[in-house]
Amino acid sequence: MPRLYIKANDLEELDSVRIFDDRGKEVYYTKDDFIATGHRIKIYMAETITECAYVQEKYDRLGDTRFEFASKDRFGTVARDPMSRMARYLVDYDEAWEIVGDPYIWKYSVYRGAIKIIDVRSEPYLIPGQALNLTPTHIITFDSESDVLIGLTFVLAIYALNKYRY
């Protein structure tokens, strides 16, 4: 099962974040921009420096915020459920994804029906080749290799929805 690692301090403090694999190799990096229509997080392949995915802030007619996430030919949106007092999310994607857990503290899972496809945890971890001590790290585990990039954009969309709420 593929895993990606994001240093929690970098994500909170910097507008550019490196994303590592199990061996400590940088596989993606992100760049957060603010443009006239809202926030946009671009995801680049680390080796080729080409944009491979993005997360874009969008507004509807009622003024509610949602984030569009896209990777190659796969895309969807995620928004906070305005009818719920709890942290519930409305996911519009071609597969029925459901979030179980608490995204505010990076401890949740994403299910497609009854199958867990993404697991997100935040805990002290030593990324190989990146640190000499344990650092707060967001660990994203995917069920299959084909869901890695779209899953990463989805996780960053949830993060952006929680961070940039007004």
Give short role names for the model-derived ranges.
Residues 1-166:
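Intrinsically disordered, low-complexity proline/glycine-rich segments
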